[in-house]
């Protein structure tokens, strides 16, 4: 059973031709996700000088994770957890190198 909305509030997914405000549009975009793709090529006398491939994904964090996009979790500049794992890896590497050097001097 659905609860009726108060008469003054429009449905965010209304399809009766009513205009949507910015918040409704943003909610839809973040909920569903939008992909914008484009290529820019610069040629001079049939010689390709530059190719730029643009891919833009606009989505909520939850939707991005559902799509398998989670690069911010492993980027040390963006995630404290990634910095911790990087620090632990560097620490283990330094300990291994110290053990090797101590083994050579004995």
Curated annotation (Swiss-Prot):
- So which domain of life are we looking at? Bacteria
* InterPro entries reported in the protein's UniProt record: Gas-vesicle_GvpA-like (IPR000638), GvpA (IPR050530), GvpA-like_CS (IPR018493)
**Pfam families noted in UniProt:** Gas_vesicle (PF00741)
Q: What does induction of this protein depend on?
A: Gas vesicle production is induced by growth conditions that promote production of secondary metabolites tiancimycin A and B.
**Cysteine disulfide links:** none
Q: PROSITE patterns, per this entry? A: GAS_VESICLE_A_1 (PS00234)
Sorted alphabetically, the Gene Ontology cellular component annotations on this record are: gas vesicle; vesicle membrane
* Residue ranges crossing the lipid bilayer per the database entry: none
Q: Which UniProt keywords apply?
A: Gas vesicle
Q: What compartments host this protein?
A: Gas vesicle
Keyword Ion transport appears in the UniProt entry = no
GO MF annotations, alphabetized:
structural molecule activity
According to its UniProt entry, the function of this protein is described as: A minor component of the gas vesicle, might be involved in nucleating gas vesicle formation. Gas vesicles are hollow, gas filled proteinaceous nanostructures found in some microorganisms. It is not clear what function gas vesicles perform in soil bacteria.
Additional comment = This strain probably produces some gas vesicles from the probable gvpO-gvpA-gvpF-gvpG-gvpJ-gvpL-gvpS-gvpK operon; it can be induced to produce more under certain growth conditions.
Record's family?
Belongs to the gas vesicle GvpA family.
Tell me what this protein is called.
Answer: Gas vesicle protein J
| Taxonomic lineage of the native organism | Bacteria, Bacillati, Actinomycetota, Actinomycetes, Kitasatosporales
This protein's gene is called: gvpJ
């Amino acid at each position: 059973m659905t609860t009726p909305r108060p008469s003054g509030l429009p449905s965010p997914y209304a399809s009766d031709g009513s205009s949507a405000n910015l918040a409704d549009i943003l909610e839809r975009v973040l909920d569903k996700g939008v992909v914008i793709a484009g290529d820019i090529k610069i040629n001079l006398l049939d010689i390709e000088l530059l190719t730029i491939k643009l891919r833009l994904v606009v989505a909520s964090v939850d939707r991005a994770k559902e799509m398998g996009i989670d690069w911010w979790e492993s980027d040390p500049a963006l995630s404290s957890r990634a910095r911790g794992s990087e620090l632990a890896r560097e620490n283990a590497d330094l300990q291994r190198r110290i053990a090797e050097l101590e083994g050579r001097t004995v």
